[in-house]
Amino acid sequence: MKSQKTLIKMFSTAAVAAMSVSSLFAQTNLGADCGCPPVASRPTVLLTTLAGAEGQLLAKNTILTCDKTWILDDKIYVDSLKSLTIQPGTVIKGRKAATGNANALIVQRDAKIFASGTPTCPIVFTAEADNLDGTFPTASTGQWGGVVILGKSFVNLTVAKNTTSGSTTRYCAGIDGTGFIEGFSAANRRNVYGGGANVDEDDNSGILKYVSIRHAGDVLPVIPGTPADGSNELNGLSLGAVGRGTTIEHVEIISAADDNIEFFGGTVNVKYITTMFGADDMFDFDLGYKGKAQFYFGVKTATNDTTTTISSDNGIEADADDDKAAPVHALRSHPIFYNCTFVGNNRYNGNADNSGPAGLQAKELTEGEFYNNIFANFRTGVNFATARDNATNLGDGYDNWTSADNAYNTGTGVAVKGSLIIKNNTFFGNRYPITKGAMTTGKWSAIVTNPADGVKLSLGSADDMTQFTNDGNLVPTTIAGFNTVWAMNSTTNAVSTVLDVIPSSNLASTITAPADGFFTPAAYRGAFDATKPSWLSGWAYATVLKTSAGLQSNPTDINQDGMTDMKDFNQLLTRFNKANN
């Protein structure tokens, strides 16, 4: 039942004090549990003072301590065979660069980042102007570049099929299985990712745990001095061919100017991820990504937000590859998702880049497996791409999904039946459960003005809906305790109606994630278990803004170890009567 996630109205004095400490202390006085001084008292240090002329950190093992605020004032590289360690409670602030440029942290191939925060001592990357009290506008995206990690796992770029063409920046780096990461000049070989002939799917780029990345991302020109065209973008977190030896858990990406998180190939697995208020997709994968994801919570701007910066893009944007000719099945993206909750705002922005507000946008021969997820408040639950760029190699995401007995089965060419699986998901508050077609701005405009238009963008057929339903997907009209219509001012961050994405009781599923060492078996739909405290503890940005009901863990569990005991009481005593800022 949901009672464990609802704050009890009456507490003892000690419990109330513990609640205040648990939720506020970790946010406005980051790192206090770890002995870090108040953020306002920390002197600032430019990261360029630790770097060489090309932005490379000079020490073999650089350590950023929490007694200073570190300013990311350029592109800073962790070179191959070097490491960067960031202590719990540390704050790194990105400085906004001149137009056409962006300051970012780049971890190269064979380098490592060790950023292991804790629930009460998270590590925060944010904008230089953010004073960390929750008042910096969530509408302020793109204030710095973001975090980029480059690995030696798999990426399906090839010299023959992925050379420089027009304005695209997703092209091979001269060796099959390598590429230049988006957002940077291709002339710089330090921006290469992928293992080439020596792919290591278990490649280890380090650790990101209890890390918050805020107000990052940018859309940059391919050629300096020319207008940006949307093909060269930095995300909040960009992962280029990162291997499954890398640990990425309890990470949140807030107010990114492009995608919150994007996977360019790779095999890295991610767990307990939060994305909020991004300007593009919540989760974007391409170029042969084959990782796993579980317990992912994503939300767009509020449903009442009418500002010009309103985001309307996808929950998941799924691509198999960027080779439109005849990609080999074994080289396509094929991730596996369990227990995610994606909440859109049910709005349409005709000016948005690649505007396509779908819970799951299945493009470019999309493959993958999607189980036990909730997609809410999108224009369409799933959109299947049906048109290929190359007419001699037909088949696309729709044809990978449709069963052989579907009367609308049109798959030919390189489609692989059953390679896209969508089972036991819940679709709530979406205008349409299934659509088919290329979701360009024009096509969306047509369907918005004429919902019966079956030419511009087709609604799912009767056979489609039969398969959709037989696969255990549900389209309920109500979910008890689940409220995705909420109100927030993205300039002042004032929340007038809270979001609640945890149902009163679990939405049952007949499918359970396998106990394979990564997945946690969970026979319910969505990112949160209604019978347990939320995994979004007091450190998360949602609790700072108080956007969401039910996302605060047990308030008396100060150290967030799942139990209220003497350890929590002792921590309370050490903090009692101390200021929270």
Where are these regions (language model features)?
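Bacterial N-terminal signal peptides that target proteins for export
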Residues: K2-A14
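Sec/Tat signal peptide C-region and signal peptidase I cleavage site
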Residues: K9, S22-A26
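Beta-strand/loop edge motif enriched in small/polar residues
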Residues: Q27-G550
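Short, recurring structural edge motifs at helix starts
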Residues: D73, P327, N554-G562
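Amphipathic alpha-helical repeat elements characteristic of tetratricopeptide repeat
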Residues: Q552-S553, M566
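Alpha-helical segments with a strong preference for the paired helices of cellulosomal dockerin domains
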Residues: I558-N581
